[in-house]
């Protein structure tokens, strides 16, 4: 209804504050070395879990029994209609190892130079993970109740197309995913 849209317009978040918070979260996340190889994403999963917990968003972590360095995190923003399959926001936690000689900054310090954040994973793909996370945080803060559940899935092992990434989650935990749509770096 028009009242709903007017309420959103006049009660919209402080977008400058949202941008500042997003930048700070991205910088923190970029400082977590999740290079693959070796593929140890435990600190990345712990960091994501901490942020979800701080914002009261339900999440679950999954350890790969064959390789405990590989973990995944699934957060959920519940919808009002349990008959609808969820929208899955998919991203990966691991990054390609940094060639320090090719960097003019420390790739794990997330420096801002001339308005640009420099850090391993800034483009591929920790920035998308933060955008997806911030979407859930903002929806929760604004009191939005989606009809369809929205899930955030951060996975390991993408950079080497390993067997313990999203394929492992599909094989072992499809019942927790089962999405209608998946939104990742390639689109919807």
Task: Enumerate the language-model features and the residues they cover.
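Short linear interaction motif-like sites in intrinsically disordered regions of transcription factors
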Residues: 5, 16, 48, 104, ...
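Acidic/His- and Gly-rich active-site-bordering loop/insert found
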Residues: 12-120, 129, 139-148
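Acidic/histidine-rich catalytic neighborhood of metal-dependent amide-processing enzymes
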Residues: 117, 123-188
């Amino acid at each position: 209804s028009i009242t709903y849209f007017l309420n959103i317009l006049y009660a919209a978040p402080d977008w400058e504050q949202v941008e500042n918070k997003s930048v700070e979260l991205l910088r923190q996340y970029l400082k977590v070395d999740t290079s693959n190889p070796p593929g140890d994403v435990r600190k990345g999963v712990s960091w994501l879990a901490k942020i979800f917990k701080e914002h009261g968003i339900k999440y679950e972590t999954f350890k790969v029994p064959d390789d405990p360095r590989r973990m995944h995190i699934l957060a959920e923003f519940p919808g009002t209609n349990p008959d609808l399959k969820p929208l899955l926001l998919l991203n990966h936690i691991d990054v390609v190892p940094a060639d320090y000689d090719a960097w003019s900054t420390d790739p794990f310090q997330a420096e801002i130079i001339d308005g640009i954040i420099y850090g391993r994973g800034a483009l591929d793909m920790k920035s998308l993970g933060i955008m997806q996370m911030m979407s859930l945080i903002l929806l929760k803060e604004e009191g939005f109740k989606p009809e369809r559940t929205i899930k955030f899935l951060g996975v390991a092992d993408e950079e080497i197309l390993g067997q313990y990434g999203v394929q492992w989650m599909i094989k072992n935990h499809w019942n927790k995913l089962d999405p209608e749509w998946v939104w990742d770096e390639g689109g919807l």
